[in-house]
């Protein structure tokens, strides 16, 4: 049995992105659903869907239980292994042919490397140590390139939304 579903979700997403998986299955909870909605809205994942699978209970072989899972589709971007200093040099035919070869290389599949959009996920407030902040104390993640996800009285919000609304809450995790 999983006691901390948020840590489990973050660990599953982190491990799947490290091995470049296309999607990952996560146990469904309302909190996990809200975090997945925020990750999709902020552009860290492509999309998600709710899967319902029938499973036979171990204790009662005749009854069936519904296992609801979140299927999260991870997002990657292509990183090119080329030097872009060639782009501003088109003065002779050789440079033009080099430029055309560079364009062919960029369109082709040579030199492409999938890099995850999520660099890291970190659980901040844990079941043993809850961390609460108000909107004035809330720091920025990597100078604004990442987000904090907070549990507030108005629901699950990002740090930017919480600052805009002027409310604080429990800092669940950080994503960058």
From Swiss-Prot:
GO CC list: chloroplast; ribonucleoprotein complex; ribosome
RNA-binding in keyword set: yes
Record-level GO BP terms: translation
Family assignment from sequence similarity: Belongs to the universal ribosomal protein uS8 family.
Subunit structure: Part of the 30S ribosomal subunit.
Annotated source species: Stigeoclonium helveticum
Coiled coil: none
Subcellular location: Plastid, Chloroplast
InterPro entries found in the cross-reference section: Ribosomal_uS8, Ribosomal_uS8_CS, Ribosomal_uS8_sf
Entry annotated with the keyword Cell membrane: no
Alphabetical keyword list: Chloroplast, Plastid, Ribonucleoprotein, Ribosomal protein, RNA-binding, rRNA-binding
Pfam families: Ribosomal_S8
Protein name per Swiss-Prot or TrEMBL: Small ribosomal subunit protein uS8c
Protein role: One of the primary rRNA binding proteins, it binds directly to 16S rRNA central domain where it helps coordinate assembly of the platform of the 30S subunit.
Signal peptide region: none
GO molecular function terms listed in the Swiss-Prot or TrEMBL record: rRNA binding; structural constituent of ribosome
